Curated annotation (Swiss-Prot):
Its EC number is 2.7.2.8. It catalyses: N-acetyl-L-glutamate + ATP = N-acetyl-L-glutamyl 5-phosphate + ADP. InterPro entries: AceGlu_kinase-like_sf, AcgluKinase_fam, ArgB, Asp/Glu/Uridylate_kinase, Glu/AcGlu_kinase, NAGK-C. Its main location: cytoplasm. This is Acetylglutamate kinase. Substrate binds at G70, G71, R92, N194. Keywords: Amino-acid biosynthesis, Arginine biosynthesis, ATP-binding, Cytoplasm, Kinase, Nucleotide-binding, Transferase. Pathway: Amino-acid biosynthesis; L-arginine biosynthesis; N(2)-acetyl-L-ornithine from L-glutamate: step 2/4.
Amino acid sequence: MNADLTVVSPQIQAQILAEALPYIRKFHGKTIVVKYGGNAMTEERLKHGFARDVILLKLVGMNPVVVHGGGPQIDNALKKIGKQGTFVQGMRITDEETMEVVEWVLGGEVQQDIVMLINHYGGQAVGLTGKDGGLIRAKKMQMPDKEHPGQFLDIGFVGDIEAINPAVVKALQDDAFIPIISPIGFGDDGQAYNINADVVAGKIAEILKAEKLIMMTNIAGVQDKQGNLLTDLSAREIDEMFEDGTISGGMLPKISSALDAAKSGVNTVHIIDGRIEHSLLLEVLTEQAFGTMIRSH
C-alpha cells in the first residue's frame, strides 16, 4: 500500500482512511512509544515523513512518545575531534570526552532537529533528557566480562536505569504535547550517563503502560542466520537465538529491551523497517503486517 496520500487518487485516499478507522478507534487515548533511529533519522525524506506521521497519531487521539537514538551523528561528531567509536556487546564505550559529545549531540543537535520538524508541521513537541523532571535516574553500568566470569568491564559513563519518573511525560501528554526523549540519564550526584536508546524506550513503554512499543531500525526486522525475516518471535525462540549467536552486537540490547517490555505488559512490541516511508503509520493504522513481533510467551 502506498501511504503517501499526495500521489494517489481520491478513491484510494478514502479507502486508506476507512481502513484506518478501526485502529484509530482501538488506540484512541492509548500511549504509543516509538524508538526512532537509523535511516529514518538521517534521510531528509524519511525525517519529514516521520514528523508528519507522529503528528497524525496525536491528532487522531493517540499519545505518541518518541525516544530517539543518534549513533551516526555521535560517530560523525567524534570523528571531527579525532576519536573513533568503540562498542562492547552493543554498548558504546563512553569516556569523559565522549560523554560530553553524546550530551551535546543527543540533547542538543538531534533532539532539537526532531522537535523543530514536528513543530514546523503544526505539532507541539517538547524535548526532554533524563534530567528534566527527574525522568531517568541512572547508575554506572556493570557489564559482565564474558571471557572472565565474575569480573566486569569498565565501559565508562554508560548507564543502567535505576528508576523512571513518568510525571513530566504524563503532564506533557495531558497538555497535548509530544514528548521527545534523549536517552541520557543522571546519577544522584548529577553525573550524566549514556544509556542505550532501545533500553530507554522499553523501560518508558513499561512504566507508561503503553499499548504499543515500536522500534524503528535499518533492517526489515529480526533475521535468522540465513537472512530470512522472522515475523514472529517468542521468548523461547529469542533465548535460543541469544545462545547460538544469531542475535548479537547492536541487536542484543534492542531485542532484550523489546522482550522485557512484552513481559512487563506492553500489549504489542514490533521491530519495523524505518527505511520504508510512513512505516510508523503502516504499523499502527493498517492491517499490513511487516517487521517482527516480539511475544512474551
